[in-house]
């Protein structure tokens, strides 16, 4: 990448912000609508890959406090633990718990363990895709 790609770098900063924001929306909307951890993970991964393309891979990896291989493992553990825990309470594998909390400022909030499961999926997808892309590009995996 040339050092004077000002337009690419400027547009990348804006597009990465939009991708991360849309990724959060898709992740949280996925409980009731299409989306969730897998699609959100793909969107987050595309934001990271765009940063790697526009900027130096080593600079981006040094500025991000994320080890994508560990993120992949954490995601698999979170999803697995969320799926297994109901079995200790006599419920089937992957049973989900749902409740509603009433918070002073936010009002009524719907809370479900599916969100933790989907977060594990998101972490795994981001970890796998970014690790594979870094390995294929010859960058640090």
Swiss-Prot record:
**Highest taxon of source:** Bacteria
Q: Which GO terms describe its cellular component?
A: plasma membrane
Q: Which ranges does the record mark as transmembrane?
A: 10-30, 35-55, 70-90, 114-134
The record's GO molecular-function terms, alphabetically, read: antiporter activity
Keywords from the UniProt entry: Antiport, Cell membrane, Ion transport, Membrane, Transmembrane, Transmembrane helix, Transport
The topology of this chain with respect to the membrane is: Multi-pass membrane protein
Matching InterPro entries? CPA3_antiporter_subunitB, MnhB
Q: What is a single Pfam family found in this protein's UniProt entry?
A: MnhB
Q: Where in the cell is it found?
A: Cell membrane
Q: Extract one GO BP annotation from the record.
A: monoatomic ion transport
- Subunit-structure text: May form a heterooligomeric complex that consists of seven subunits: mnhA2, mnhB2, mnhC2, mnhD2, mnhE2, mnhF2 and mnhG2.
- Please state which protein family the record places this protein in: Belongs to the CPA3 antiporters (TC 2.A.63) subunit B family.
Q: What does this protein do?
A: Expression of the mnh2 operon in E.coli is not able to catalyze Na(+)Li(+)/H(+) antiport. It does however confer higher growth rates than the control strain at up to pH 9.5. The operon may encode an NADH-ubiquinone oxidoreductase.
Q: Write the protein's name.
A: Putative antiporter subunit mnhB2
């Amino acid at each position: 990448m040339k050092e004077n790609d000002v337009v690419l770098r400027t547009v990348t900063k804006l597009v990465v912000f939009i991708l991360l924001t849309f990724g959060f929306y898709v992740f949280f909307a996925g409980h009731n609508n299409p989306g969730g951890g897998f699609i959100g993970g793909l969107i987050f991964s595309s934001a990271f890959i765009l940063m790697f393309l526009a900027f130096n891979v080593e600079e981006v990896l040094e500025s991000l406090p994320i080890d994508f291989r560990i993120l992949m493992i954490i995601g698999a553990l979170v999803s697995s633990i969320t799926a297994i825990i109901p079995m200790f309470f006599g419920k089937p594998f992957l049973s989900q718990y749902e409740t509603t909390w009433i918070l002073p400022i936010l009002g009524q909030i719907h809370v479900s363990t599916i969100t933790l499961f989907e977060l594990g999926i998101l972490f795994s997808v981001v970890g796998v895709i970014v690790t594979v892309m870094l390995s294929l590009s010859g960058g640090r995996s």
